């Protein structure tokens, strides 16, 4: 065991000497490699969907996809619109404009329903009549009152399209099951001759690829943009439903990642400053862990792995875990400098004494984190895989980039 340790110390001493000798090449290659990986971060996707918590081969996900193929999406976007006088010409005209604006300008809509295109089913004698509720748009007070009576007396509308007190009405939007991206324009010459109730896309013209979380966010953002044009004191619009909730969670995730990173950098930087009382003692470890985090996230994006709720802790976690190795090296290096050693010798001695401990600590940490890759919940498995990879990337830059920068 002693011989092994002595050989390891010699190996780390020689390795540090080699890095110091070719430090400019090492720094250049490290920067190029990190930039190549980090350049993919712009393609990193945030996934807040329920399906994102399941593995691609999970039987539950397979069953759910079969359900969506047959019955469509089971989550809706709901607009609740408040007014003291819903059955007024001004309100109904604005509701119609909102309905048509959403229908014509927003992508990925499969179906939508409101008072504007609702079906009216009623019996007259022995005859069952089915037509549009607003087949004839009301223009007089008498027609408006008749419409109000029909709507408020119909149990199929109550708490569906109109509240019991008549102060709220809804506009329900169902997005496509399949993505519209990349669809061939095979059906562009055919137009739907049906009424407004059916004048929507045919479930995305089944491309075989389910609508993505990114397209869901674009869909929700487009709805918010249109709603903003109609929002007023006498036309108050509230948005609810799973797509809106998932979009809000995504925004919170993006905000939280940035916030946690800033807090982690400030806290770690402050601790390093108190510990070393040197600018280099603060800047160099932060450079190493920042490059490691950027490379890890870039690798995630390159491999097409989405950022999910549990993985939001990954950047901050890697910052906290990765900085420890740099602290060991810097502490021993500065001790050597205080004893009067030359910088190159102090760096080599630091790696000779701490190199094996740093490697073993990183390996055991990575192995422990990798055990999460066996988890049944996909984001937990992703967290285990990429946190272990991130620890090893951090180790690599600690052994190569850090001594090159120190020299």
Give residue spans per PLM region:
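Membrane-embedded transmembrane helical bundles of large multi-pass transporters/channels
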Residues: 1-48, 178, 208-407
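Short amphipathic beta-strand/extended segments in non-transmembrane regions
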Residues: 80-82, 96-122
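Soluble periplasmic/extracytoplasmic beta-strand elements of cell-envelope proteins
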Residues: 76-80, 113, 170-174, 238-240, ...
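Structural beta->alpha junctions
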Residues: 54, 81-90, 173-181, 203-214, ...
